[in-house]
């Protein structure tokens, strides 16, 4: 077996917490394939780069010879995960959950080895719990302990409603670990409480508690909030190569390094070298291109990555896109013509309409004919004429976080 310290260093890369590291070392010393679990409720049909942070860690365990379980929460998806929310999350219908689950299976194989990945659905055991089983499960935790969760604590303090089924959700996710006899569970930092519930329920069931490994949440294209389809600040793993390339190139230079740390498979010393080169005068755009190509090659292929780079060069650099440009941040619904005016690209909305009719308005290099539509959410590069550019981040106004 590979030296445990070497394996541990590899597994720790990019993690936020390992609870506990001592337990993980003990399990690794047993020199057996560990059961490593990652669960996801199929609340939307697309998997985006934010999801791949934990999927990449699951892949790492897989490459080290461990058993990986991708758990699709078809049962819990109909309950609704309250993690990080400031209001009750609406549950999905059975039909929505199953439809989204099918697309999940296809997309995770862009990262995981289909021959070595076990896909399980938690309805297999949760639907059999029944009323008596659910009551026994609920008896393992108190309301006081549930209110230790930051999101519940904030909502309770703000007199915002918390539905009973939201207290049940962490117990259901924790019971998944009991049913699978998981050795390790992965999740984002917002899942820490749920992962620790799994440890406690395993102890109550007389099993060895799982190791909980949390990973940072990937900040989305807006540079502020976690990547989320509902916020429009995401890149889906099935998006066209040219779209992926353009979106990666739109992120800020500061955010680029966070993405390198969480998404790139490059050795850490290589990333440090790239950062040093930028600090010494290398154009960060060139380093961003390397990241864009790495991600496109992973989710498509190298040929697609090279083609996307060439298209970007033809579209932007030959069009004299500047390395630096004004940056703006707006929130809420905004008409494209208004956005162009507010960003200083046109003196009036009527001028925006006229410029578009003459083919002079572009978003990420693509011509836009109708500026009467709403501007897209997220971060995009807007161009009017040959020399006016602005990078604009349009945030969605949150109602449910």
UniProtKB/Swiss-Prot annotation:
SMART domains: S4. One of its GO terms (molecular function) is RNA binding. GO terms for cellular component: cytosol. GO terms for biological process: tRNA aminoacylation; tyrosyl-tRNA aminoacylation. It is found in: Cytoplasm. ATP binds at residue 229. Residues 334-394 form the S4 RNA-binding domain. Coiled coil: none annotated. A motif ('KMSKS' region) lies at residues 226-230. Keywords: Aminoacyl-tRNA synthetase, ATP-binding, Cytoplasm, Ligase, Nucleotide-binding, Protein biosynthesis, RNA-binding. A motif ('HIGH' region) lies at residues 42-51. It catalyses: tRNA(Tyr) + L-tyrosine + ATP = L-tyrosyl-tRNA(Tyr) + AMP + diphosphate + H(+). Disulfide bonds: none annotated. Its EC number is 6.1.1.1. InterPro entries: aa-tRNA-synth_I_CS (IPR001412), aa-tRNA-synth_Ic (IPR002305), Rossmann-like_a/b/a_fold (IPR014729), S4_RNA-bd (IPR002942), S4_RNA-bd_sf (IPR036986), Tyr-tRNA-ligase (IPR002307), Tyr-tRNA-ligase_bac-type (IPR024088), Tyr-tRNA-ligase_bac_2 (IPR024108). Belongs to the class-I aminoacyl-tRNA synthetase family. TyrS type 2 subfamily. Homodimer. Catalyzes the attachment of tyrosine to tRNA(Tyr) in a two-step reaction: tyrosine is first activated by ATP to form Tyr-AMP and then transferred to the acceptor end of tRNA(Tyr). PANTHER family: TYROSINE--TRNA LIGASE, TYROSYL-TRNA SYNTHETASE. This is Tyrosine--tRNA ligase.
């Amino acid at each position: 077996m590979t030296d445990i310290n070497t394996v541990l260093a590899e597994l720790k890369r990019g993690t936020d917490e390992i609870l506990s590291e001592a337990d993980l070392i003990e399990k690794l010393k047993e020199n057996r394939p560990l059961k490593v679990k990652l669960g996801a409720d199929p609340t939307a049909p697309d998997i985006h780069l934010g999801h791949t942070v934990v999927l990449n860690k699951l892949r790492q365990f897989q490459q080290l010879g461990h058993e990986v379980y991708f758990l699709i929460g078809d049962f819990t998806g109909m309950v609704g995960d309250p993690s990080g929310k400031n209001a009750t999350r609406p549950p999905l219908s059975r039909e929505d959950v199953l439809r989204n689950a099918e697309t999940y299976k296809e997309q995770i194989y862009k990262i995981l080895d289909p021959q070595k990945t076990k896909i399980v659905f938690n309805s297999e055991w949760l639907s059999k719990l029944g009323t008596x089983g659910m009551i026994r499960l609920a008896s393992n935790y108190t309301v006081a302990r549930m209110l230790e969760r930051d999101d519940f604590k904030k909502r309770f303090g703000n007199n915002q409603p918390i539905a009973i089924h939201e207290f049940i959700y962490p117990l259901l996710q924790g019971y998944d670990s009991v049913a699978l006899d998981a050795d390790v569970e992965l999740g984002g930092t917002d899942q820490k409480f749920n992962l620790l519930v799994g440890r406690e329920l395993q102890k109550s069931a007389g099993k060895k508690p799982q190791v909980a490994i949390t990973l940072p949440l990937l900040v989305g294209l807006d540079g502020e909030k976690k990547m989320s389809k509902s916020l429009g600040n995401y890149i889906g793993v099935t998006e066209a190569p040219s779209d992926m390339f353009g979106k990666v190139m739109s992120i800020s230079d500061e955010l680029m390094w966070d993405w390198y740390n969480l998404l790139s498979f490059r050795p850490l010393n290589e990333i440090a070298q790239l950062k040093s080169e930028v600090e010494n005068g290398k154009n960060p755009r060139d380093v961003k291109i390397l990241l864009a190509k790495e991600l496109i090659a992973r989710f498509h292929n190298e040929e697609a990555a090279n083609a996307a780079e060439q298209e970007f060069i033809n579209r932007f650099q030959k069009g004299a896109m500047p390395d630096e440009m004004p940056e703006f941040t707006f929130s809420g619904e905004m008409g494209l013509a208004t956005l162009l005016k507010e960003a200083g690209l046109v003196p009036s909305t009527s001028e925006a309409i006229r410029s578009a009719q003459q083919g002079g308005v572009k978003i990420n290099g693509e011509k836009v004919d109708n500026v009467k539509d709403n501007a897209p959410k997220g971060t995009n590069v807007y161009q009017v004429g040959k020399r006016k550019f602005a990078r604009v981040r349009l945030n969605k106004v949150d109602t449910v976080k």
